[in-house]
């Protein structure tokens, strides 16, 4: 990863720090924001909170990138073809130079050959940006290779400002979703249970930033098609294909009453003249999959399963109309139900074939946030994400 001179992860020890709010790291002084009354009056080391650790790592990386600003900037553009191990040519040189600048490649590796050392460096760079680690610098990799050093610094400084406003205390049981990371984490007793890939809203239908609580789950959910989707996406298809609704196990209501869609002349309908609601019955092809997770919010968004699991293989996953699709959503449901019989409960509910609502014993807090950088404690790595909504200004 980005190589900078740092000491080992610090701990707070009353005998060594004399109850101080700062730690001197080489020539870098880092504010830890630790009140004195949190330091135990014995020699037992006290670990940093997650927020304090994030702030510490941010300062380290800002210092690292600032030291790189004196170096000549390397501007890279996608060459129009994939490069892989075994290739050679002058187009490889600037890529190696950028990897060297970031401390991912040794200085004596500047040859025109794409060797195994370069492949490993590319994989490390891809992991640093949370994209597929295949060692092949394609379009998505070049999206980040083109970043100037100043962008890394600005991203970290914005993150530092946001982190400094946050509090250390969070609910012990928590679902945390970071939109630019396309990731969901579930914690219990402050420990990470599992991380899931997610699909979030498109730029024009953004997933909102919010805090709430998941109250209940619905197995075999019925999908109420939003009006905008009905008139924009479905109406043109219904005009062309009289079997469109039947093929997708859908039905229509008007004023709350189910109507025969075969008797409707959809050619006379428009975005200003569509007095119907469309529903999709619970089924294997239902857009919400096998389960949805409900929480109070003014945006009518929720978490749900999806039959289109192949989309989770993509690096950038802003495909939805605002709701959040979860990979392996039934596994998340098992973790949330938190009983010894959870698998049996889920199997029983799914077997019914119709929507079944299950309330949680205790609501689970959910935070949907937008952070384009994050220190990954499991990987000991600062990761940078694509600013999919352009909010990181």
Model-derived regions: residue spans:
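Short, well-structured active-site flanking segments
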Residues: 132-140
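Sec-dependent bacterial lipoprotein signal peptides
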Residues: 1-2
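Well-ordered beta-sheet/strand-loop patches within structured domains
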Residues: 5-36, 40-105, 113-119, 123, ...
């Amino acid at each position: 990863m980005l190589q900078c001179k740092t000491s080992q992860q610090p701990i707070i020890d009353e005998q060594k720090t004399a109850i101080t709010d700062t730690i001197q790291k080489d020539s870098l002084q880092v504010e830890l924001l630790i009140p004195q009354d949190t330091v135990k009056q014995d020699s037992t080391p006290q670990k940093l909170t997650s927020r304090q650790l994030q702030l510490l790592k941010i300062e380290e990386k800002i210092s690292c990138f600032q030291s790189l600003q004196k170096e000549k900037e390397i501007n890279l553009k996608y060459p129009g073809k994939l490069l892989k191990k075994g290739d050679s040519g002058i187009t490889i040189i600037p890529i190696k130079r950028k990897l060297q600048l970031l401390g991912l490649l040794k200085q004596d590796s500047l040859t025109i050959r794409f060797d195994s050392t370069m492949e490993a460096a590319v994989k490390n760079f891809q992991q640093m940006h949370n994209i597929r680690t295949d060692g092949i610098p394609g379009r998505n990799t070049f999206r980040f290779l083109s970043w100037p050093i100043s962008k890394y610094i600005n991203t970290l400084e914005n993150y530092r400002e946001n982190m400094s406003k946050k509090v250390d205390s969070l609910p012990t049981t928590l679902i945390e979703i970071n939109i630019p990371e396309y990731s969901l984490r579930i914690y219990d007793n402050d420990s990470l249970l599992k991380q899931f890939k997610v699909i979030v809203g498109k730029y024009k239908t953004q997933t909102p930033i919010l805090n709430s609580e998941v109250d209940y789950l619905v197995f075999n959910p019925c999908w109420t098609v939003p009006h905008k989707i009905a008139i924009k996406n479905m109406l043109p298809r219904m005009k062309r294909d009289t079997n469109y609704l039947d093929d997708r196990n859908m039905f229509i209501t008007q004023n709350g009453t189910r109507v025969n869609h075969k008797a409707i002349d959809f050619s006379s309908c428009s975005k200003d003249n569509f007095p119907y609601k469309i529903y999709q019955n619970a089924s294997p092809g239902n857009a919400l999959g096998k389960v949805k997770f409900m929480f109070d919010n003014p945006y009518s968004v929720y978490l749900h399963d999806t039959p289109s699991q192949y989309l989770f293989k993509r690096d950038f996953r802003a495909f939805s109309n605002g709701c959040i699709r979860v990979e392996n959503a039934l596994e998340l449901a098992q973790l949330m139900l938190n009983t010894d019989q959870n698998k049996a409960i889920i199997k029983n509910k799914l077997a019914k074939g119709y929507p079944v609502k299950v309330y949680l014993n205790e609501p689970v807090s959910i935070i949907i946030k937008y952070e384009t950088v994050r220190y990954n404690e499991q990987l000991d790595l600062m990761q940078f994400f694509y600013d999919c909504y352009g909010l990181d200004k």
